[in-house]
């Protein structure tokens, strides 16, 4: 039946082993090196992506905190501005009140001065008229001393009436 050729089988087996050894020496090792480099590169990229993701999360958290802090600072600035505006409003009202009081006092002082001037002017006119009337009534010349006495009495009477 079948006759097995052992020499051919051994030759093919040796040739296969030599081919396997050559492939492993020159093809498989460089191919495995490329595969290992590729695997390492993929692992490095995954690690870098994880680092980048963590860094992005940290940056996002920092930005969130910065926005929150800025919001708080803005709220604080608004509160300070409101407080300052209320304080300035009160100061303006107080200044206006004080100015009004000062103007009132000045007006009262001016009225008092004008009243005193009017009274003095009236006294002078009354004194002049009194002298004229007294001169005509008495029909005599008064000396200066008597005239002053008469004026003082008349002014005293006029002052009491005022």
Swiss-Prot record:
UniProt keyword list: ATP synthesis, Cell membrane, CF(0), Hydrogen ion transport, Ion transport, Membrane, Transmembrane, Transmembrane helix, Transport
Q: How does it sit in the membrane?
A: Single-pass membrane protein
Location(s), subcellular: Cell membrane
The primary site where this protein sits is membrane
One example of the protein's molecular function in GO is: proton-transporting ATPase activity, rotational mechanism
Q: Which Pfam families match?
A: ATP-synt_B (PF00430)
Family affiliation: Belongs to the ATPase B chain family.
Name of the protein in question: ATP synthase subunit b
What's the source species for this entry? Halalkalibacterium halodurans (strain ATCC BAA-125 / DSM 18197 / FERM 7344 / JCM 9153 / C-125)
């Amino acid at each position: 039946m079948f006759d097995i050729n052992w020499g051919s089988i051994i030759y093919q087996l040796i040739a296969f082993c030599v081919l396997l050894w050559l492939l492993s020496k020159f093809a498989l090792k460089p191919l495995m090196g490329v595969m290992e480099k590729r695997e390492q590169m993929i692992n490095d990229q995954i690690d870098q992506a994880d680092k980048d993701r963590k860094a992005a999360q940290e940056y996002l958290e920092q930005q969130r905190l910065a926005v929150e802090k800025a919001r708080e600072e803005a709220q604080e600035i608004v509160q300070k501005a409101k407080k300052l505006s209320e304080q300035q409003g009160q100061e303006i009202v107080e200044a206006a009140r004080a100015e009004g009081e000062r103007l009132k006092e000045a007006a009262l002082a001016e009225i008092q001065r004008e009243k005193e001037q009017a009274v003095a002017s009236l006294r002078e006119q009354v004194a002049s008229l009194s002298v004229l009337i007294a001169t005509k009534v008495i029909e005599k010349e008064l000396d200066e001393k008597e005239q002053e006495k008469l004026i003082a009495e008349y002014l005293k009477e006029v002052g009491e009436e005022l």
